Swiss-Prot record:
Disulfide-bond pairs as recorded: none
Source organism per UniProt: Escherichia coli (strain K12)
Gene: gatY
Induction: Constitutively expressed. Up-regulated under low pH conditions.
Family according to the record: Belongs to the class II fructose-bisphosphate aldolase family. TagBP aldolase GatY subfamily.
Protein name: D-tagatose-1,6-bisphosphate aldolase subunit GatY
NCBIfam families, sorted: cbbA, PRK09195.1, PRK12737.1, tag_bisphos_ald
Length: 284
C-alpha cells in the first residue's frame, strides 16, 4: 500500500533524527516534481493541501492522483489536510480517504482550541487518521488563514504538554518565530523555547513557515525535535518566477508542455534542497 498515514512517517523521523518535508501542492506540475524527486532520492514526503487546494483540484481527483503516482513510482506518499478549520469539511475528506489532518484552531482561546481539536481527534482516530494541531500562532497568511505579525503568539512549553494530553493529537505544530510566506530578513528563531517544548512534549513536532529558512536553522530545529517541515511559498515563488522569466524571454511560446519545463526545473531545485536540509534522503 503506497498511500500511507503520516503517523508512522513522523514516528520514524523522531526515532531517526531527521524530518519529513510536507510540500503544499498547487497544480499537477508541483505534484509531479515533488513525487519524482522524492522517488529518485528515496525520501519520505507528505503531499499537503490547504482547503483552497482541495477546492481547486477536487478531493476525489487529488486522492486519485496521489494514489496513482505512488503506485507509478513504487513510493509511499501521505496526503495531508493543511490548515483546515471546519469539522464538517475535515469529516467529509476523511470519509473520502484522507488519512492525515491538521485542524487549525490556534486562533481560539486555549480552552476552546482544546475543545475544537479534541472533537476532530475523537472523530479521526475512529478511522485511523493522524491529527496535527497548532498551539500558538504564526504570522503571515496561508490560504484564508491570516495573522498579523503583531498578533502572532509563541507556543508556551507548559501549555503544550497540557494541550497534547487533553486533545490526544499525534503531532504538534509549534510557533517559535517562523511565519507564513517568505522573509524580508532572516527570522530570529527561539531555539531555547523549542528545546523547552521538546522537554515537555514527546510528540513529533512540526514547523510551519519554513520557506526561506537557512539550512543551518532548519537542521538546528530538527536536532531540537522538529520532525515535519512545511514548505509552500518557496515552491510557488520558484514556479512563478521561472515561468515569468521564460515567457518574457520567449513571448512566442504557446505550449504549456514546453514553457512549464523551466518552472518544474526551478521547483525541482527547491524540493531537492529541502530534502537534503531535512536529512531524509534514503529514508523511504
Amino acid at each position: 500500500m503506497y498511500v500511507v498515514s503520516t503517523k508512522q512517517m513522523l514516528n520514524n523521523a523522531q526515532r531517526g533524527g531527521y524530518a519529513v518535508p510536507a510540500f503544499n501542492i498547487h497544480n499537477l506540475e508541483t505534484m509531479q516534481v515533488v513525487v519524482e524527486t522524492a522517488a529518485n532520492l528515496h525520501a519520505p514526503v507528505i503531499i499537503a493541501g490547504t482547503p483552497g487546494t482541495f477546492t481547486h483540484a477536487g478531493t476525489e481527483n487529488l486522492l486519485a492522483l496521489v494514489s496513482a503516482m505512488a503506485k507509478q513510482y513504487h513510493h509511499p506518499l501521505a496526503i495531508h489536510l493543511d490548515h483546515h478549520t471546519k469539522f464538517d469539511d475535515i469529516a467529509q475528506k476523511v470519509r473520502s480517504g484522507v488519512r492525515s489532518v491538521m485542524i487549525d484552531a490556534s486562533h481560539l482561546p486555549f480552552a476552546q482550541n482544546i475543545s475544537r481539536v479534541k472533537e476532530v481527534v475523537d472523530f479521526c482516530h475512529r478511522f485511523d487518521v493522524s491529527v496535527e494541531a497548532e498551539l500558538g500562532q504564526l504570522g503571515g497568511q496561508e490560504d484564508d488563514v491570516q495573522v498579523n505579525e503583531a498578533d502572532a503568539l509563541y507556543t508556551n512549553p507548559a501549555q503544550a504538554r497540557e494541550f497534547a494530553e487533553a486533545t490526544g493529537i499525534d503531532s504538534l505544530a509549534v510557533a517559535i518565530g517562523t511565519a507564513h510566506g517568505m522573509y524580508a530578513s532572516a527570522p530570529a528563531l527561539d531555539f531555547s523555547r523549542l528545546e523547552n517544548i521538546r522537554q515537555w512534549v514527546n510528540l513529533p513536532l512540526v514547523l510551519h513557515g519554513a520557506s526561506g529558512l537557512s539550512t543551518k536553522d532548519i537542521q538546528q530545529t530538527i536536532k531540537l525535535g522538529i520532525c515535519k517541515i512545511n514548505v509552500a511559498t518557496e515552491l510557488k515563488n520558484a514556479f512563478s518566477q521561472a515561468l515569468k522569466n521564460y515567457l518574457t524571454e520567449h513571448p512566442e511560446a504557446t505550449d504549456p508542455r514546453d514553457y512549464l519545463q523551466s518552472a518544474k526545473s526551478a521547483m525541482r531545485d527547491v524540493v531537492s534542497k529541502v530534502i537534503a536540509d531535512c536529512g531524509c534522503e534514503g529514508r523511504a
